[in-house]
């Protein structure tokens, strides 16, 4: 009482201090605050109106919270999780009937918990979960009937436990065994049922040293034969201890015997010297027994068996779920003795109990409706006795989420249908792809055939065009009089031969090979040897064909002669190379250039081509006829050679290139027909005339030199003497003609690319269009033949013609005399 008085006085002093300092933070709670808003104490007891739940407006830094004497009915984790600093919590004298499992798990600093004078019915492990620092636990004056053996396992630091004034009948021997710091355990005013099940707890209690020494207030209330016995034998009516009685009656197998049933009493009286059958205690000896162990009366009093609660424990009410639906449930309740007590089915919702129905049958099915999914519903079987409600067993129901409707299960026939459909689709795709592939391949073949036909047609047309270009004058003027024989003319009376390409430029005028269209090779050595006709050499490769054997028989004599002069040809080629090398070696300085003489064939070819190969006889005549037909309308012009002129290196180089090109161009037509010595006319100078002709040809731009890029500037030819008188034997003006503008078809036959642009792909020459367009695969074939060196494609007559063209009068006669000697020696 003194302690309570001092506590009340302290509360009054604290309240007065708050009123004086203005520390009243809320109208419903008295707060004692520290620095920076820290709250030490919050007194919320006896609130008007009383609290029905833990208030949330209190600062979370609170250390001491007092909510006693309100109407709080439940303790939830959500309402206490904010108060992490809480060390003292007073919930005394409320209406708490439900504590959520883990409700105090956020108060790991809590040391004092007061829950006295409430309506708790049982104590479980989950209620005290997380209270590792708890030291004082007050649960007095509740309705606790069951204390689980694991209730205090998470509270190893408990020093004081108060479970007095409850309804505890049984306690397990291991309930308080793990509490090493326990010094006070108040269990008085509980209706203990003294049976063999309580023997283990009584042994622990006898060994425990209770600081309060309240043994006289712990008594047995049932069974009636042991009513009034003290748990430890210290009482007002003698020294009767239930511990000694149970130790004398109960054995190690007492729990198994109690499950089977109560022991049968001994029949008859016990005789001295003979032991009664178990389970009575051993027979008394002659020695006097202790006062607390002797029975009243004489020794012939029969032993009375102690009734136990084993049958009652087995006969507890049972509740189980029978059926669950979307919004309802059916439960089954079994009662051992429905008429011994009044049983009801209660629904607990946050410690608020509501009666569902009264239970009056030994087994009854109850349907629960208007339930929601994913919601916990707790139902308990409660009995009422002497105005008190006893909770026997509970059941929690949670309706699951509505299951989704199951999808249709495919039948075996449906699965087979799906499989066949998939296989059919795959087979159809294969057929479609095959058809597409067949169509594409067929179309490709048709395109290839069309390309081949077009190439053949183009080749035929080109062949015809080339023939017309080369032999057009013969077709147009077949009655043209041949050139009359006569002596060689002087320079002033000689007509000019059209401009011809050089020998080194022969390769670029060959037709590019193709897989479909044959191409021609002009002036090659094999042409001379085999004697192919000119029509075959226009659009075919210069290689011997299958009919070459017949041609060899006809030209065997001439071929042998040509073989004999191979050495002369090689010497001529060497001479050409030496001339080119010596010409390129001149870079600057005054240079005197002697223009080479120009050669003209003025005699008829029918009588002057005894030493020519068959391939050169007709072509030479055609070129001369074409030349004369074009020159007929051209004005005459004389040209003189320039010597001793001083020019810059660039101008000299440009003129030298022009001279080389002019000489090469003049050599083209002489190769076609190499006449005898008496049919060659020397025209001096020729380089100036050829330069003027090339310069004017480029100005006309009629595909005469169709190649990209710039050309070296050629200086104009110096003025020459007046043109010589015409040659009467030819019936036309015998003079050097200016380059005339010929008709386009004929002009294209003479227009070739410059040899310095061999590598360029663009060309407007009609001879280059003889090949068919090649596909991309044919262009990159590794087996394509590469161009050979220029010396390999130079014909024998080619070199000889060049040497004859640039030779002077004496040299020309020497060459021809040597040629005749070789021929005569070969014939002999």
Swiss-Prot record:
Sequence positions bearing Phosphoserine: 461, 645
Boundaries of every LRRCT domain copy: 190-252
A GO biological process held by the record: synaptic membrane adhesion
Region (Disordered): 259-291, 517-552, 624-649, 696-732
InterPro entries, per the entry: Cys-rich_flank_reg_C (IPR000483), ELFN_Fn3 (IPR055106), Leu-rich_rpt (IPR001611), Leu-rich_rpt_typical-subtyp (IPR003591), LRR_dom_sf (IPR032675), LRR_TM_domain-containing (IPR050541)
Composition bias type Low complexity, residue spans: 632-649
Span of domain Fibronectin type-III: 312-399
Pfam families, per the entry: Fn3_ELFN (PF22986), LRR_8 (PF13855)
Residue stretches spanning the membrane: 419-439
Biased composition (Pro residues): 274-285, 713-727
Organism superkingdom: Eukaryota
Keywords: Cell projection, Glycoprotein, Leucine-rich repeat, Membrane, Phosphoprotein, Protein phosphatase inhibitor, Repeat, Signal, Transmembrane, Transmembrane helix
UniProt-listed SUPFAM superfamilies: L domain-like (SSF52058)
Molecular function per GO: protein phosphatase inhibitor activity
Main localisation: membrane
Stretches assigned to the Cytoplasmic side: 440-828
Ranges occupied by LRR repeats: 61-82, 85-106, 109-130, 133-154, 157-178, 318-342
UniProt subunit comment: Interacts with PPP1CA.
Role noted for this protein: Postsynaptic protein that regulates circuit dynamics in the central nervous system by modulating the temporal dynamics of interneuron recruitment. Specifically present in excitatory synapses onto oriens-lacunosum molecular (OLM) interneurons and acts as a regulator of presynaptic release probability to direct the formation of highly facilitating pyramidal-OLM synapses. Inhibits phosphatase activity of protein phosphatase 1 (PP1) complexes.
Name of the protein described by the UniProt record: Protein ELFN1
């Amino acid at each position: 009482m003194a302690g309570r008085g001092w506590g009340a006085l302290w509360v009054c002093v604290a309240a007065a201090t708050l009123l004086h300092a203005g520390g009243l933070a809320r109208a419903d709670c008295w707060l004692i605050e520290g620095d920076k808003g820290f709250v030490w104490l919050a007194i919320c007891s006896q609130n008007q109106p009383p609290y029905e739940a833990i208030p949330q407006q209190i600062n979370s830094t609170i250390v001491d919270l007092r909510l006693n004497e309100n109407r709080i009915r439940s303790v939830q984790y959500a309402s206490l999780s904010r108060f992490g600093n809480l060390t003292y919590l007073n919930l005394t004298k409320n209406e708490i009937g439900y504590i959520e499992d883990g409700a105090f798990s956020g108060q790991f600093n809590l040391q004092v918990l007061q829950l006295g004078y409430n309506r708790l019915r049982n104590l479980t492990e989950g209620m005290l979960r997380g209270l590792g620092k708890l030291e004082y636990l007050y649960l007095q004056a509740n309705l606790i009937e069951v204390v689980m053996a694991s209730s205090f396992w998470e509270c190893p630091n408990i020093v004081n436990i108060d479970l007095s004034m409850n309804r505890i009948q049984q306690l397990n021997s291991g309930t308080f065994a793990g509490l090493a710091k326990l010094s006070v355990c108040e269990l008085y005013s509980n209706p203990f049922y003294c049976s063999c099940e309580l023997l283990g707890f009584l042994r622990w209690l006898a060994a425990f040293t209770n600081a309060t020494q309240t043994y006289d207030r712990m008594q047995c209330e049932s069974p009636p034969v042991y009513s009034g016995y003290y748990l430890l034998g210290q009482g007002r009516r003698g020294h009767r201890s239930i511990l000694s009685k149970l130790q004398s009656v109960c054995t190690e197998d007492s729990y198994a015997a109690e499950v089977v049933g109560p022991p049968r009493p001994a029949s008859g009286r016990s005789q001295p010297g003979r032991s009664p059958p178990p389970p009575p205690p051993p027979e008394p000896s002659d020695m006097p027994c202790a006062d607390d162990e002797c029975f009243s009366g004489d020794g012939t009093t029969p032993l009375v068996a102690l009734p136990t609660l084993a049958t009652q424990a087995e006969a507890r009410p049972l509740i189980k779920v029978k059926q669950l639906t979307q919004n309802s449930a059916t439960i089954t309740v079994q009662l051992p003795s429905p008429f011994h007590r009044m049983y009801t089915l209660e629904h607990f919702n946050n410690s608020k109990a509501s009666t569902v129905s009264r239970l009056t049958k030994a087994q009854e099915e109850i349907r629960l409706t208007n339930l929601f999914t994913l919601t916990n519903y707790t139902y308990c079987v409660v009995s009422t006795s002497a105005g008190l409600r006893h909770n026997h067993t509970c059941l929690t129901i949670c309706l699951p989420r509505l299951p989704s409707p199951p999808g249709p299960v495919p039948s075996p026939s449906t699965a087979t249908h799906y499989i066949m459909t998939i296989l059919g689709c795959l087979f159809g795709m294969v057929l479609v792809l095959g058809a597409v592939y067949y169509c594409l391949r067929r179309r490709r073949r048709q395109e290839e055939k069309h390309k081949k036909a077009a190439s053949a047609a183009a080749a035929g047309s080109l062949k015809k065009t080339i023939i017309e270009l080369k032999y057009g004058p013969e077709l147009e003027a077949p009655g043209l009089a041949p050139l009359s024989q006569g002596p060689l003319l002087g320079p002033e009376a000689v007509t000019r031969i059209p401009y011809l390409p050089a020998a080194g430029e022969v390769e670029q005028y060959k037709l590019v090979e193709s897989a479909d269209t044959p191409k021609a090779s002009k002036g090659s050595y094999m042409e001379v040897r085999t004697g192919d006709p000119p029509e075959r050499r226009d659009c075919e490769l210069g290689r011997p064909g299958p009919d070459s054997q017949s041609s060899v028989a006809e030209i065997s004599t001439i071929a042998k002669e040509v073989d004999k002069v191979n050495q002369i040809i090689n010497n001529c080629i060497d001479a050409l190379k030496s001339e080119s090398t010596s010409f390129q070696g001149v870079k600057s300085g005054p240079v005197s250039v002697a223009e080479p003489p120009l050669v003209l064939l003025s005699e008829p070819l029918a009588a002057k081509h005894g030493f020519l190969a068959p391939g050169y006889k007709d072509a030479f005549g055609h070129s001369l006829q074409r030349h004369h037909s074009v020159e007929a309308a051209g004005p005459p012009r004389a040209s003189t050679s320039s010597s001793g002129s001083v020019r810059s290196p660039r101008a000299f180089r440009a003129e030298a290139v022009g001279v080389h090109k002019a000489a090469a161009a003049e050599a083209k037509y002489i190769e076609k027909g190499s006449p005898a010595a008496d049919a060659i006319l020397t025209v001096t100078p020729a380089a100036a005339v050829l330069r003027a002709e090339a310069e004017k040809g480029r100005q006309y731009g009629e595909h005469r030199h169709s190649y990209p890029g710039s050309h070296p500037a050629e200086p104009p030819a110096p003025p020459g003497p007046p043109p010589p008188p015409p040659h009467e034997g030819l019936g036309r003006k015998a003079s050097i003609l200016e380059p005339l503008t010929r008709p386009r078809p004929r002009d294209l036959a003479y227009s070739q690319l410059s040899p310095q642009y061999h590598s360029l792909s663009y060309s407007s020459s009609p001879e280059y269009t003889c090949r068919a367009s090649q596909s991309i695969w044919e262009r990159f074939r590794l087996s394509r033949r590469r161009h050979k060196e220029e010396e390999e494609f130079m014909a024998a007559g080619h070199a000889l013609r060049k040497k004859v063209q640039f030779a002077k009068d004496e040299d020309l006669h020497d060459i021809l005399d040597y040629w005749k000697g070789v021929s005569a020696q070969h014939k002999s």
